[in-house]
Design a protein with these regions (language model features):
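Phosphate-group recognition and catalysis centered on beta-loop-alpha active-site segments
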Residues: 2-317
Length: 317
């Protein structure tokens, strides 16, 4: 049994924790829905992975537009630096899978992104591969109209600046996953990224994510308004302590990087928890019902959206 004196102490500590959480929740711009403790437009966010990647070429403005039309809360993009230091949207370290680089620059193998200038990248077709390979089988199933297929031919690789401008024009949000390269320092990458975000006026409309947590530390140091998400494969030994030390706002684990109890605990502490990447309707339904989950990355935002609408009946925009 707790003595009266100790009970008052426990109450004071509990109230102190609640007050701290309240400060976290009220801190910053109300539009900044990714900060730890912030209010979201709905309990779980529909995060279009590389845009609506099942319906349009990944990491293009076309896939972003599709995701926006569907009603996704944000789109997630991958970004890398070009030879001349420009951030562009590209998942792979090389260009051959998702562009016609082999035909345009046959002598430049292995076609690393960092070996090309942004001008050279703008010469490439980043859309035809999607029509040719139908990576998610959605063309075969009739989900991608012929008019869209024709429009994707010749689609260009966007710069991150263009993606930010597109997002801002549509009063939307974006998750920027930063791919780190060995020949550019993390400090330099972080400084250039933060400057670009600030110039675009997107500090509270972005989430910066990365597997490189030292880069995230630097982003947070440069501008505490910018939310950061720790991408992980396997959970850290002491996840809460680690995330607090990192000043992370969001924990983004792989399928082996979380348990239901752990997710619930993080959610109760105000951290966002974004799970990746799930496409099957059965998986989407399973994880939207998991306590503590605040976002799901999916290549099929068109599948997740009706599930969230059914649960929350809130207009994402």
């Amino acid at each position: 049994m707790i003595s009266p004196g100790k009970s008052w102490f426990v109450i004071l500590i509990t109230l102190g924790e609640l007050a701290l959480f309240g400060l976290l929740a009220d801190a910053g711009d109300p539009d900044n829905i990714f900060l730890r403790g912030a209010q979201r437009p709905r309990p779980i966010l529909n995060i279009a992975h590389a845009g609506a990647a099942s319906l349009a070429p990944q990491n293009t403005l076309a896939s972003g537009w599709k995701a926006f039309q569907i009603g996704a809360d944000l789109w997630g993009v991958d970004t890398r630096l070009t030879k001349d230091g420009v951030f562009v949207l590209m998942h792979d370290g090389t260009l051959d899978r998702t562009t016609d680089v082999e035909a345009i620059f046959p002598e430049r193998a292995p076609w690393r992104v960092g070996d090309f200038t942004v001008h050279e990248l703008k010469m490439l077709d980043a859309g035809s591969w999607f029509v040719r390979t139908d990576p998610f089988g959605q063309i075969k199933s009739g989900e991608v109209p012929e008019v869209d297929q024709h429009a994707y031919v010749g689609e260009k690789i966007p710069t991150l600046r263009e993606a930010l401008e597109f997002t801002r024009e549509h009063d939307w949000r974006i998750d920027i996953e930063v791919k780190v390269v060995d020949d550019v320092s993390k400090e330099e990458i972080a400084q250039q990224l933060v400057t670009l975000i600030e110039e675009a006026g997107m500090e509270v409309w972005v989430l910066v994510s990365s597997f490189d947590h030292q880069l995230l530390r630097e982003v947070k140091r440069l501008d505490p308004r910018i939310p950061i998400a720790a991408l992980v494969i396997v959970a850290p030994w002491n996840p809460v302590e680690y995330l607090e030390e990192l000043q992370a706002d969001v924990y983004a684990p792989s399928p082996v990087g979380f348990t239901s109890g752990f997710v619930a605990r993080l959610g109760a502490l105000g951290f966002g928890v974004h799970l990746w990447t799930y496409n099957a309707v059965s998986q989407l339904r399973q994880f939207v019902s998991m306590e503590g989950v605040s976002g799901i990355y999916t290549d099929f935002p068109q599948r997740l959206e009706p599930i969230l609408d059914e649960l929350f009946d809130v207009d994402a925009h």
